[in-house]
Amino acid sequence: MDAEQKLLLRHAILRQLAAAAPVSLPPVTLLHGVALAGFRLDDRALQIELDYLAGKNLLEITPSALSQGLPRARLTATGRDYLEAENLL
């Protein structure tokens, strides 16, 4: 995947989280969303992207309230500001 495709993938993830806000989403839901956007990822590749975006403070990964072992992702205020600045909302 080249740099432009990675940017589009990251935008797809962030926009999906923005649409769900303030609710967090599990990785499996994000996988379905990026597949609908035309990206084919496995669990590991998605986790790498989520970790990257979390490192940039654009999203946060938290454990599920019902099961601590199941992570969920949520858009941060910084992530929303980024999407607004890029006219993606």
What is the role of each PLM region?
Residues 54-64:
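A short, conserved structural fragment
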Residues 66-75:
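Minor-groove-contacting beta-hairpin "wing" of winged helix-turn-helix DNA-binding domains
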Residues 74-89:
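Short, amphipathic alpha-helical interaction segments positioned at domain boundaries
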